[in-house]
């Protein structure tokens, strides 16, 4: 296999699950707008199920996820579109406890990735913060 070959078999389970999802799709009545007028910005941590946390269901909310639940330029762009085009009138920024992004600083993550994987990530800003409350205040101010 050449370096440019795509390992399709690595996604067979996902393709099978998607076929089943299509066959049993139960959300065709949803419009794509946020039925409850809410957007959530939260962490990519797979332990978090944002809909369950706030007692909502598919179609109610726009969910944006990234490392550390930070309001980046791309998140802000998406929130603007959701607000003006997709019925969002409330935004919940929802970081969480025990977040890896609050355990280290930028230099630590760059060093770790370089040492363990040989990949130089110094051109990226990970937006780590040991002060989650301070970061939340900054992010809320960006939204305002």
Q: At which residue positions do the language-model features occur?
A:
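Short glycine-enriched loops at secondary-structure junctions
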Residues: 42-47, 69-70, 97, 107
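Ordered, amphipathic secondary-structure segments that act as subunit-interaction surfaces
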Residues: 86-96
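Divalent metal-coordination and catalytic microenvironments
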Residues: 18, 40, 64, 93
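Divalent-metal-activated hydrolytic enzyme cores
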Residues: 1-34, 69-76, 81-86, 101-144
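N-terminal short beta-loop-beta anion/metal-coordinating cradle
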Residues: 20-24, 29-58
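Glycine/charged-rich beta-loop-alpha catalytic/anionic-binding loops adjacent to active sites
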Residues: 56-67
């Amino acid at each position: 296999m050449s370096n440019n070959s795509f390992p399709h078999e690595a996604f067979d389970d996902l393709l099978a699950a998607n076929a089943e999802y299509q066959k049993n799709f139960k959300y065709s009545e949803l419009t794509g707008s946020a039925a409850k007028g809410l957007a959530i910005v939260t962490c990519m941590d797979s332990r978090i199920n944002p809909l369950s946390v706030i007692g909502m269901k598919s179609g109610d909310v726009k969910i944006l996820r990234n490392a550390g639940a930070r309001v980046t330029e791309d998140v802000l762009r998406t929130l603007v579109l959701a607000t003006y085009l997709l019925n969002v009138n409330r935004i919940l920024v929802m970081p969480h406890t025990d977040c890896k992004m609050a355990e280290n600083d930028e230099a630590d993550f760059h060093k770790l990735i370089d040492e363990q994987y040989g990949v130089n990530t110094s051109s990226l800003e990970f937006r780590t913060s040991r002060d989650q409350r301070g970061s939340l205040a900054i992010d809320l101010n960006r939204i305002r």
